[in-house]
Amino acid sequence: VAALYAPTGGIVCPFGLTIALAENAADNGVEFKFLTEVNEIKKDGEGYILETGKGAITTKYIINAAGVYADRFHNMVSGNKIHITPRKGDYCLLDKEAGGHVSHTIFQLPGKLGKGVLVSPTVHGNLLTGPTAVDLEDKEGNATTAEELAFVIEKSSIGVKNVPFRQVITSFSGLRAHEDGDDFIIGEAEDAPGFFDAAGIESPGLTSAPAIGVYLAELVAGRAGAVQKKDWKRERRGIVRPEKMSVEERAELIRQRPEYGTIICRCEGVSEGEIIDSIRRTLGAVSLDGVKRRVRQGMGRCQAGFCTPRTMEILSRELG
């Protein structure tokens, strides 16, 4: 038996990282257009016209980072066609009581469909197992199946014994964007000047995302003659976490802002103050899932069975 030990390996919260980067981008002037579907992209002189459900957008440069839909947009402007297959992966998430079962991510030998089923702690103290690797054609096909979850349970036991699967609190699946050429496609399309791809980004896409972002920014800046902002805001205001404070710090916070003393999510210890902050901050939450991704309301053992009505009341009150 042999293994490769990688002490520099680490884990992050993927949606927490994504939201933090988006908030920082917005604070630096990036405009987000949510619920705006791109229906068609047409070349227009030296630029492009994006036809959306909310009108046309004219631009000289496009960065195509549309995940499993990146092939659709690339093929609208380029004769060098690509095809992306959605590769579904099912996961099991275990309660925090199981979080100490392993102290670092345990991978198996990779295969042609990916790195195999892993067992890993999360940054919040849970235990995560998965994923499977099933190729689909449905770009929205993210339903879990009993067969695939059984596969996760079976294969997890190869690398880690006695995983306490009786403590599973939820299961979910996601789609990786697998390009038929088995590689990332990063850069300017040869026959579509100003159209830049970040397509076919699957594992280790999260790890490489910061470097991909810098690389594409440099490419676009070089074409556009752009220079780095002098007043760039490097720091993003974090979300106040009373559970990480000392008793004295928490008491002072609650004295000044009583909403931090009202616990809404008992499983994760999330206060009303944290939920309000998640809604009011830059690119704030507008849904239960939005709150969940920012402050973990509903992510605990009862999976939002207790806190959903209270959170909906706060969302309604804050958003009108």
Q: What would you call each of these model-derived segments?
A:
Residues 308-312, 317:
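Accessory DNA-binding and partner-docking regions appended to nucleic-acid-acting proteins
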Residues 4-61, 69:
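Helical element adjacent to the flavin cofactor pocket in flavoenzyme catalytic cores
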Residues 14, 20, 110, 114, ...:
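C-terminal catalytic lobe of FAD-dependent flavoproteins
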Residues 294-297:
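C-terminal target-recognition/interaction regions appended to catalytic cores
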Residues 41-130, 134-145, 154, 160-163, ...:
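Flavin-dependent oxidoreductases
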Residues 265-267, 302, 307:
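Short cysteine clusters
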